[in-house]
A protein has these predicted regions:
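Juxtamembrane/disordered regions of integral membrane proteins
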Residues: 1-113
Length: 113
């Protein structure tokens, strides 16, 4: 899902210092990206799109809505799990990242439908 990866890159690098600050406060060390895990996430997102969004969408608008809902669920699972287990994971970051994920997967679904 190259489209989602491109959209996410804007989010990640557009606020790199904010992301670094959040994750360094949680892991108590400099931010390190595991590229294999990142690629696997986008592979799972592509599987979700082709199995749950594309077959059940009649047009781009429906694909956007279903993609946004899928993104909300995927990113909320990540962010709320982090909030539940890491005391330094901030609510404002969890909310912003979840909303971003909803928008990003919605836009990616709209674009590639």
């Amino acid at each position: 899902m190259i489209v989602l990866m491109a959209i996410d890159t804007i989010w990640l690098y557009g606020n790199l210092e904010g992301h670094k600050k959040q994750f360094e406060s949680v892991q108590k060390s400099p931010l390190q990206i595991d590229k294999v895990a990142g690629i696997l996430f986008y592979l799972v997102a592509a599987i979700a799109f082709f199995n749950f969004i594309k077959p059940y969408s009649k047009n781009k608008e429906e694909a956007f809505k279903k993609g946004a809902l899928m993104g909300l669920c995927m990113y909320a699972t990540f962010d709320l799990t982090n909030k539940a287990i890491f005391t330094d994971y901030k609510w404002d970051y969890a909310i912003k990242d979840t909303l971003w994920g909803s928008f990003a997967l919605g836009l990616a679904s709209y674009t590639i439908f």
